[in-house]
Amino acid sequence: MVTHRQFPNHKVFEMEIGGRPFTVETGKVAELANAECICRYGDTVVLTTCTANPIPKAGIDYFPLTIEFEERMYSVGRIPGSFNRREGKPSERGILNSRIIDRPMRPLFDEELRNDTVVTCTVMANDYDNPVEIVASLGASIAIASSDVPWNGPVATTNVCHLNGRYIVNPSTEEREASDCFVCISSTFEKVVMIETEANEAPEAVVLESIRIAHETNMEIVKFINGIVAEIGKPKFTFEKAAVNHDLLDDLMNYGLNQIEYALDTDDKNVREERLTAARLDFQEKFGEKYEDFDTHIEVCLYKMQKKVVKKWLLQGKRVDGRGMDEIRPLAAEVGVLPRVHGSGLFTRGQTQVLSICTLNTLSAAQKLDTIYSEETKRYIHHYNFPAYSTGEARAARSTSRREIGHGALAEKALLPVIPSVEEFPYAIRVVSEVLSSNGSTSQGSICGSTLALMDAGVPIRRPVAGISCGLISDQETGEWRTFTDIQGVEDFHGEMDFKVAGTTEGITAIQMDLKNKGLTMEIIADALERCRKARLEILSEIMLPCIAEPRAEVSEFAPKMLSMKIPVDKIREVIGSGGKTIQKICADTGAKVDIDDDGSVFISAVDSAAAYAAKKMVDDICFVPEVGKIYCGKVVRILPIGAFVEIAPGHDGMVHISKLENRRVEKVEDVLNLGDMTYVKFMGFDEKGRANFSRKDALKEMENNK
């Protein structure tokens, strides 16, 4: 006997976002998870689940939250291109999407929660126009908020772009690519908790208005989510907060807070670490025997003591290294620091130092992407490496972290708006930023270093790009807050915000904002944007432009020489030849490499310019089509009793009839022309058989009249 399964808890909720329906289904699938939902926006569908371990994880001092963004190739009707035809590790964009979901949610969890929590977002259908990251972010917020996991959400996430003077909520892929400013904003009902921006040198006012519109949209979505939670939400479980020995903390505060102040009061990270180590040893000698659990709690106590000092100082307008609130650390910039590489730039800001190296190659070296997104290739690539030695740690190298991928992507999108088009500069471009020393804001250092390396490599970028970060400290009781420019490591660690802004003298190209508090008001955001604008202009004018004012006129002698041209589509077959014989001969004769696209774009690369231009001439000769009425200089290649054949380009000859040789009667062709002679002829057109006809007498007459 078969019984039909019922789903008594199945519910459907719907609202309109950006003029399109957004639908949420719950209570039908994944019933063993703490919470689940299926979100649909257009034809983009994402399944989101939330699971949590009821038992706290021992021996850790952080909240173990994991966001998994699962990309499924079936969502776009494709089979993976891997050997086993199965999805592997997440794509770079998938990792970036997981970070977009993680960053606004993490600050809203209790920092003393220790239960493993995993949110999994599986993309089940993707229509390309309704963004998967928005659907997944909203699904994650709904799943966590309706689960039994303690959380101070919900949050909502919205994209907004500025296109032709209009602000568009959750734009299509086409609208996003055509816009001059695109923002991805996460916020609670009250405040903004995450900002991600890519822009084409957008003014601060446009960015700020985009953020405001996104926040207003998010407020309506938060109301919608709260309605769902009110109907299906589970009671939150109670948890035991991470234990802190308050007696030890009180003793340390009374005895050693002045030692912590002394340790922090320096602009040298090494000196700071030495002083903190000395203070810890003193505390251990003083209280190690009194408290048996001293070793268990000392790190937490030291963290709280440092945070107390840093917060007090910043609210008073004092910084650990003695700088003013708008003062940038000492800067240095240098280009051409490595031999043989195509371009290099060393950028130093205080004890943060980044070496960026630029490599140029043929367009065939562009990164090919096999993902669920519409982008198929990536011509400009930026990679960011953060080795352990940059922070003085003794740790073996490991695989690329999500943080490294995120920082590399930030620098990549910061420079992308100023990268020349393929037509202007037909190269694939890769920049690698090696962090040599880290004391805060290495991602912004890599942006500055990348600009230097690109200019040193002769890449004709539209304008130099610089990056700077802004910090925040606030007092929740009094409402007092302060922002400060160019955060260093200890300010990043104990502060509440890392507001990273990149741009040119004309406007913003990228923003990434991370928070450790419950959100920002529009007033704080506006203040941070203005602070970063002033600092960015100072870095460009005082350090970077004096180092290298404009891109090199020529690419490095060690870089391949590239030329691009366009040929008629109907000529592609002739250039390639039967079985590729013609194009292979061009490559063999010149030593160049020739690539042809279906639209007739031709890209020629060679080790030297002479070889590249030789290959270009051979392609030009094959595609040559004479213009009726135009005069050409050609070589006599054959003589017949009725006329002479003149070749005006390799493989392109035609007949000059004996009657068209001179203005007088000619008895014999050899009386005027001989084999091998060079002569001017005028192209008169093709006959019914497609043969070219030339006239020498018309050419001479026209040339005489033009004297």
Language-model features: locations:
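Long, basic N-terminal domains or extensions that often function
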Residues: 2-240
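Extended amphipathic alpha-helical scaffolds
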Residues: 2-53, 61, 238-374, 560-574, ...
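Glycine-rich, flexible beta-strand/loop modules in the N-terminal catalytic cores of phosphate-handling
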Residues: 33-118, 123-125, 130, 196, ...
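Conserved phosphate/anionic-ligand binding catalytic regions in large, soluble enzymes, centered on
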Residues: 35-37, 130-149, 335-358, 439-459, ...
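Flexible, glycine/charged-enriched surface loops at secondary-structure junctions
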Residues: 111-117, 152-154, 221-239, 270-271, ...
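Mobile "lid/hinge" segments at catalytic clefts and subdomain interfaces of large enzymes
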Residues: 148-264, 454-553
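Long, charged amphipathic helices and adjacent flexible linkers at domain junctions
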Residues: 235-246, 538-565, 613-633
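Single-stranded RNA-binding regions, centering on S1/OB-family and related RNA-binding modules
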Residues: 558-560, 569-707
